[in-house]
Amino acid sequence: MAMENDELKNLFTSALRRIIGKGISKKYKTLIEKAQKKRDTAPYGEKPDAVKTHLRDMIILPSMIGCVIGVYQGKDYVSVEIKPEMVGMKLSDFSLTYRPVKHGKPSIGATSSSGFVPLK
């Protein structure tokens, strides 16, 4: 998927444009190269193997579309399949480092008003 630089600039925020303008470092380039290599060697119709990385601040570029990247979240790796809608976002946006809290019903000792909760 070939995109012109002007089209890419419209997808990125000003902060991302500044980061891209400085240039992509070697560690990001090697991640892109590994992901593209896995994508190109995968059999037709199958997902490529995940490329594991700790680079959560990597900006998703159009050349990464179709790749599967394992993003480290502190304990294990979360597989993220790169889609066109993800261009311009960071890998960390798709791999939460915490579990959202699911609040249950109050029980005895939770608050002073929980004394009115009927017991089983």
From Swiss-Prot:
GO cellular component terms, A-Z: cytosolic small ribosomal subunit
Keywords (A to Z) from UniProt: Ribonucleoprotein, Ribosomal protein
InterPro entries listed in its UniProt record: Ribosomal_uS19, Ribosomal_uS19_CS, Ribosomal_uS19_euk/arc, Ribosomal_uS19_SF
GO biological process per UniProt: ribosomal small subunit assembly; translation
GO molecular function: RNA binding; structural constituent of ribosome
Keyword Ribonucleoprotein in record: yes
UniProt superkingdom: Eukaryota
Signal peptide residue numbers: none
Family: Belongs to the universal ribosomal protein uS19 family.
Protein name: Small ribosomal subunit protein uS19
Lineage, opening ranks: Eukaryota, Discoba, Heterolobosea, Tetramitia, Eutetramitia
The gene coding this protein: RPS15
